[in-house]
Amino acid sequence: MSTDSKSLFRSSVSNRVGQVRPPSNPFAALLVVLVSLLGGCAGLVDKPARPVLYDFGPGTATSTSVPTRSLRGAVVLADVEAAGALDGSAVLYRLGYADSHQLRPYAQSRWSAPPPQLVRQRLREQLGRERVILNPGEGAALARSEGLLPRSLRIELEEFSHFFESPAVSVGMLRLRATLLENTAGGEKLLAQRNVVVRRPAPTPDAPGGVRALTAAVDAAAEELSQWLAQVP
């Protein structure tokens, strides 16, 4: 073989060796593919929706005052009592046309506070337009300052749900028991008791409609209780 042929052969071999690349790491390649797939899937997953919070609205928009002479009609409003699901924050409904014994929660709707707290707040506001409404523990202060023992009003919330009579027709249903007690030196004395049942139509067959119907039911119950308290001697 001539010198030129040998040089040409060495050059050809050298070029081929330079073009050969070591094989890539198969595990690294697989990792890149998996990361890409996971990133794509993450973009497809929706974030969980936050529940919508409801209450009874802002209430009275103007300031009110009760004359001092109304102290003799002052009432201590105890905490509203409720049991079971009514003491939670879920907005509940019943399908009267299917199974009225089953309470069902709206999946994405919640009360801003348990219904007993919201009901007490609304009753205090509505009843306070006609008389002095005191919190538990404030009656003793009134007794010391005015020599009066205010009566106590206890409320038991028994039903508070969005009731569907049919898929398109529904009402806000409220049922409560009110007990009026006289505070005496010898203890509490039962004066009167009243069962209040209110149904108010819902404007729409959904959670917002149920909330509006239940708000109207609470206001109607407060009006009924106000008239009842005025009639008890």
Please state what every model-predicted region is.
Residues 92, 102-110, 184-227:
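Short secondary-structure boundary motifs at beta->alpha junctions and helix caps
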Residues 42-117, 232-233:
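A structural "domain/chain start" motif
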Residues 43-64, 130-185:
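Surface-exposed short loop/turn segments
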